[in-house]
Amino acid sequence: MGRPLLLIAAGGTGGHMFPAQALAEAMVRRGWRVKLSTDARGARYAGGFPHVVEIEEVSSATFARGGPLAKALVPLRIAGGVASAVAGFLRDRPSVVVGFGGYPSIPALSAAVALRLPRMIHEQNGVLGRVNRLFAPRVQAVCCGTWPTDLPEGVEGYYTGNPVRAAVLERAAAPYIVPGDYPMSLVVIGGSQGARVLSDVVPEAIARLPEQILANLRIAHQAREEDVARVTEAYDRAGLLAEVKTFFTDIPRRLSEAQLVISRSGASSVADISIIGRPAILVPFAAATADHQTANARGLVEAEAAILIPESALDPAALSEHIAAVLSQPDAARQMARNALAHGRPDATERLVEVVEHLARKET
């Protein structure tokens, strides 16, 4: 009998792809073959997957983007993707199909339903996304990264936590260097696609900090491509040492070296912050579906590991005060780091692996 095959289907943002990568790494170590089904947008985030993972770009679409003609073609594109997935599964039958959300996961999950293959989904947020909500009643297991998670009536969830990449686990519980009179690192991350509001507010907020903090501060700021130039210029005008990029490939290292993190509260970002264990200021994305980013942040905030600032209340003066409070109180910052670490779920990947292997055993 050949090695079992896991088919991972994930959509085109880091929030979907990073947990998928964590599962792929774990299953490869267990001797499984792994394929990733995603679209061209998702493939941009697949560079960190193990090299033995075969990446299949699928045809999918969303009604959320494009004009009337593009929307009219959505069903045809999805149907084409489903037909292609069915044909692929008949050639090389997956032992388990797992979806991590996003429209590009529709073809593989639909094919798994049609062929009655073992199938499951993982939802990273405290509220199911549209695609996961559609498939939740049609899979054998619904794994939840945040608890409690709002689930459709009659659907039971299994709390696994959010898997993180091996690079994050390698930095888990890395010693926290408290703020002090020496070089300090501040990391600003806006999710896999950056955050304009952070680019608008953070540079000015940092520029308002007391000189004794600014003299030692180094900044790594993730920004949208169209914002990189103006954010870089804002830091330059203030005489601040800042590295501004659209995407940092070494976020785990940067988080482990940070005295403070300013971030959106996407599920992957919250998981990374808690497992590495760093004080954070979280600014939930106000337009997130069902306000799921506020739900994601709640655990760290209630654990007194993070400060929550609603987007509507974010301004340079208020943010600057919060940054200064953390960076000028080393004992309090150390306790925030400890609280974050206690909230983390470093075994989330193993819990998810258990569900995959359980479904595979039931099939044999």
UniProtKB/Swiss-Prot annotation:
It is a peripheral membrane protein. One of its GO terms (biological process) is cell wall organization. It is found in: Cell inner membrane. Keywords: Cell cycle, Cell division, Cell inner membrane, Cell membrane, Cell shape, Cell wall biogenesis/degradation, Glycosyltransferase, Membrane, Peptidoglycan synthesis, Transferase. The keyword Membrane applies. It catalyses: di-trans,octa-cis-undecaprenyl diphospho-N-acetyl-alpha-D-muramoyl-L-alanyl-D-glutamyl-meso-2,6-diaminopimeloyl-D-alanyl-D-alanine + UDP-N-acetyl-alpha-D-glucosamine = di-trans,octa-cis-undecaprenyl diphospho-[N-acetyl-alpha-D-glucosaminyl-(1->4)]-N-acetyl-alpha-D-muramoyl-L-alanyl-D-glutamyl-meso-2,6-diaminopimeloyl-D-alanyl-D-alanine + UDP + H(+). Its main location: membrane. It is an enzyme of class 2 (transferase). Coiled coil: none annotated. GO terms for cellular component: plasma membrane. Signal peptide: none annotated. UDP-N-acetyl-alpha-D-glucosamine binds at residues 13-15, 125, 165, 192, 293. Pathway: Cell wall biogenesis; peptidoglycan biosynthesis. The keyword Transferase applies. GO terms for molecular function: UDP-N-acetyl-D-glucosamine:N-acetylmuramoyl-L-alanyl-D-glutamyl-meso-2,6-diaminopimelyl-D-alanyl-D-alanine-diphosphoundecaprenol 4-beta-N-acetylglucosaminlytransferase activity; undecaprenyldiphospho-muramoylpentapeptide beta-N-acetylglucosaminyltransferase activity. Its EC number is 2.4.1.227. Pfam families: Glyco_tran_28_C, Glyco_transf_28. Belongs to the glycosyltransferase 28 family. MurG subfamily. HAMAP family: MurG. Cell wall formation. Catalyzes the transfer of a GlcNAc subunit on undecaprenyl-pyrophosphoryl-MurNAc-pentapeptide (lipid intermediate I) to form undecaprenyl-pyrophosphoryl-MurNAc-(pentapeptide)GlcNAc (lipid intermediate II). PANTHER family: GLYCOSYLTRANSFERASE (PTHR21015:SF22), UDP-N-ACETYLGLUCOSAMINE--N-ACETYLMURAMYL-(PENTAPEPTIDE) PYROPHOSPHORYL-UNDECAPRENOL N-ACETYLGLUCOSAMINE TRANSFERASE 1 (PTHR21015). This is UDP-N-acetylglucosamine--N-acetylmuramyl-(pentapeptide) pyrophosphoryl-undecaprenol N-acetylglucosamine transferase. The gene is murG.
